[in-house]
């Protein structure tokens, strides 16, 4: 199974940057497990001013099913309730999209 790479962008409210970074520096072990169980690896979030850029790799065979399972986890819903309140959608976000998926333009292994 080929690894799929994803890039995403979202805004971060300036007044929540410190809290957001602290939350992720101390990510709950259950959240890490849920992410790994969804076949996600090499997951990073970067910040540039008031924008967050996420990168991750997906190695499963059914992305939609794995993301639905991840989203159904009560602990993930609790995490999102906290972190989503600190974020804002970029204008380019499509309907139903929180983190806006961006295209890959270059890759070297």
Where are these regions (language model features)?
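Eukaryote-biased recognition of C-terminal alpha-helical segments
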Residues: 100-106
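Short, glycine- and small/hydrophobic-rich beta-strand elements in well-ordered beta-sheets
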Residues: 32-53, 57-61
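Short amphipathic alpha-helical segments
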Residues: 16-41
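Active-site-flanking beta-strand signature of metal-NTP-handling nucleotidyl enzymes
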Residues: 6-11
């Amino acid at each position: 199974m080929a690894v799929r790479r994803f890039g995403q962008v979202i805004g971060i409210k300036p007044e929540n940057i410190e809290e957001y970074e602290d939350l992720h520096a101390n990510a709950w072990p259950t959240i890490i497990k849920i992410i790994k169980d969804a076949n996600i690896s090499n997951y990073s979030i970067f910040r540039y001013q008031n924008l967050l850029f996420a990168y991750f790799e997906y190695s499963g065979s059914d992305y939609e099913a794995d993301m639905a399972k991840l989203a159904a986890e009560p602990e993930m819903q609790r995490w999102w309730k906290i972190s989503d309140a600190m974020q804002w959608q970029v204008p380019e976000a499509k309907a139903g999209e929180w983190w806006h998926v961006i295209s890959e333009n270059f890759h070297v292994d």
